[in-house]
Amino acid sequence: MSRTTNWNPVTYARDARFVADLGKPLLELLAPKKGEVVMDLGCGDGALTEKIAQGVSVIGADTSFAQARAAQERGLPIVVVDGHHLCFKRRFDAVFTNAAIHWMQRPEKIVQEVWLSLKTAGRFIGEFGAKGNVETVRSALHKGLRRRGIDPLALDPWYFPTAEDFSKLLIKANFTVRSIEIIERPTQLPGGLLDWLEIFAQPFTNAIEKNQRRSFLNEVCERSETALRDANERWTLDYVRLRFAAVKLEE
């Protein structure tokens, strides 16, 4: 069974544009300076990368060929690369990442690769899911799989740490943590929960027979609606984010 997600730039832009829109405050934390070279790690379709590129030299990095192509169509330089194996050495003044680290299975390796990619005193600026992120839906997904005799822990793709746990990873990799905070950010979806699940819950649904997947997703929606859907049938997910800024120490 696979934890792979097949990213579709069209449906992502339609149903998940809020991911980039809500990442805009992170650009202020990045505060890029003229002449800097920045990597956007997990750049997706390049919506935020494009904004960074207005002031500095930027390279987007993503594992998805489809998303990389969408970013390239914006005129951005993109590399298709696994964040666990970046293969850059002291190249960047800053590494920026939004809503990507929680998809990466070995966060300690990611942090090490970012450290190697940065120049001395380079900045690592990011935001991703924290402990408790989308907990209602995650719990419903797990329950639905267990009911079908499938171990959800073998499929769950998400890494949602506490601030303390992620701070320890940064310090161990020889970063100085300038700031780290947990932000509770209830997020209203542009469409229904089903649209969100079809994008983000693929590692769970891939374990279900194709002719049973819609039934499984409907069950997840039913388990979640009391907590997440209001009287006007608008869905608001219990997003919790971890936002951080760290600096690479002297080598």
Language model regions located:
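A short glycine-rich, Lys/Arg-flanked "PGG" loop and its adjoining helix->strand segment in the class I
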Residues: 108-123
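Class I SAM-dependent methyltransferase SAM/SAH-binding core
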Residues: 39-86
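Conserved class I S-adenosyl-L-methionine
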Residues: 1-36, 47-51, 67, 125-148
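A short acidic, Gly/Pro-enriched loop at the edge of an enzyme's catalytic core
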Residues: 84-95
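C-terminal helical/coil "lid" or tail adjacent to the Rossmann-like core of SAM-dependent
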Residues: 178-232
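Short alpha-helix
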Residues: 158-173
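A short SAM/SAH-binding and catalytic strip from SAM-dependent methyltransferases
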Residues: 94-107
